Regions:
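A short SAM/SAH-binding and catalytic strip from SAM-dependent methyltransferases
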Residues: 110-123
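A short acidic, Gly/Pro-enriched loop at the edge of an enzyme's catalytic core
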Residues: 100-111
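Conserved Class I S-adenosyl-L-methionine
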Residues: 53, 124, 190-260
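Class I SAM-dependent methyltransferase SAM/SAH-binding core
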Residues: 47-101
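Conserved class I S-adenosyl-L-methionine
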Residues: 1-44, 55-59, 76-79, 86, 140-164, ...
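Short alpha-helix
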Residues: 171-185
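A short glycine-rich, Lys/Arg-flanked "PGG" loop and its adjoining helix->strand segment in the class I
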Residues: 125-140
Length: 260
């Protein structure tokens, strides 16, 4: 676990500013939909786990009392704080934290968010239990992450593809697995939606400063993917640029009052 934490910190510490400026992370249909489904209230305290560039924290902070933005990587927190403070925001505070072992009391928050980060976590079932623990009874968890197809061989191919580009990638899960994690942690599922997002290959590889030999290999894996992965990733050349698709899942769930 320490090795994974060190790897995540190294990968994202080196690339923190790229994630702040990344259009893939700063906006998108799934973030807009998360806001719409959650419908945050003015008196809420919100925890944003693995805030990255701070885009989710920024999206929610104008609608709630306070956002606590956490990340495992201090350089990422520093970059997010500069970005958010630069917008004149004063109701977001920042805290270094491990998503699977949160340094907060039970039942502290009205809402917990986490967006496009859990595929880096060592234990996603534990992460969901931690969300449940720090939520007030009846509180809401809203999570977005990369999604893989239910077929195991296809899921493995896509995860291996992601891990080749970013060694801190642990695993993207299926919809079935995510719903099990939430239900096992005592959540009632309120909504699930999926989104297909086109990725510019060069921009996607550039987020992790991938070198030319690795880019060639990633391109080869895209263009020679077996049928299931080829259907999911759907690589295509447009205007001399290579694009492919990743799928995201949005889960909005409520902590049941009876859950311990």
């Amino acid at each position: 676990l320490t090795d994974l934490h060190d790897l995540v910190k190294r990968q994202f510490g080196l690339n923190a500013e790229r994630y702040v400026s990344s259009t893939d992370h700063s906006k998108g249909e799934s973030l807009d939909r998360m806001l719409e489904l959650v419908d945050p209230k003015r008196d809420w305290r919100v925890l944003d786990i693995a805030t990255g560039g701070g885009h989710t924290a920024l999206a929610f902070c104008t609608r709630v009392r306070e956002v606590v933005a956490t990340d495992l990587t201090q350089e990422m927190l520093d970059a997010a704080e500069r970005f958010i403070r630069g917008k004149g925001v004063t109701n977001v505070r920042f805290s270094e934290a491990d998503a699977c072992s949160l340094p907060f009391q039970d039942a502290e928050f009205d809402l917990v968010t986490c967006r496009v980060a859990p595929h880096h976590f060592a234990d996603c079932a534990r992460f969901v239990r931690e969300m449940a623990r720090v939520l007030k009874p009846g509180g809401i968890a809203a999570m977005i992450d990369n999604l893989v197809p239910e077929d195991r061989a296809t899921a493995d191919y896509i995860n291996d593809f992601e891990k080749y580009r970013d060694p801190s990638h642990v695993r993207a899960y299926t919809a079935t697995a995510w719903l099990r994690f939430f239900r096992d942690a005592g959540f009632q599922i309120e909504a699930t939606e999926t989104f297909r997002k086109a990725r510019d290959f060069e921009a996607w590889a550039g987020l992790q400063t991938v070198g030319d030999p690795a880019k060639v290999e990633l391109m080869r894996r895209l263009e020679t993917a077996p049928p299931g992965a080829a259907e999911a990733l759907a690589p295509e050349w447009r205007g001399g640029k290579l694009f492919f698709y990743l799928t995201e899942i949005l889960v909005v769930a409520r902590r049941t009052p009876s859950h311990p």
